Amino acid sequence: RKDLTCGKYKKKEKIKKEEREFLKPNKEGKTIHDRPEEIKTREEIGHWEMDLVEGLKGQKEPYLLVLSERKTRKEIIELLPNKTAKSVSKALDRIEKEIGVVKFRETFKTITTDNGAEFRNWKSIEQSYTGSKKARTSQYFADAYSSWQRGTNENINKMIRRFLPKGTSFKGLKQEDVK
């Protein structure tokens, strides 16, 4: 009977197969050490860092996808319904449709991310929604637990936290609010 249980056991939520694949360690994709040296100097525009900012922890909450340009510190923030690789690639597809395929390739030459499950599907991040064989960008993975390798992005995330502190729900936010 339900009233006789001690209440300390909760049923774990099942992880879908396609999401489980991205929980495995990243053995594919390019690391930050494969990135061209000129990206480190910040002399050229078009090299971005990408991360997710979460709202209420443990809730089915929207997330903020934050893209930060390394030289100009320009930022693009997209509201995502969840923390999946599919929603990240859909957000990049939306941006690509908005600015055009050629402009996207010029604007987003490289994107550096952490090793989160949401960025593991590097093929969908690099590949255009048009199905073109030419990659729309190149993705590089930072080393695990090395947030300083994406310092621009981490600083912008800190600024976002001034307005949306940890523990704040993003449920009431709209895309227009975050732009």
Annotate each predicted stretch with a short phrase.
Residues 40, 53-54, 59-76, 80:
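Short conserved beta-strand segments at catalytic cores or DNA/RNA-binding microdomains
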Residues 42-46, 167-168:
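Glycine-centered loop/turn motifs
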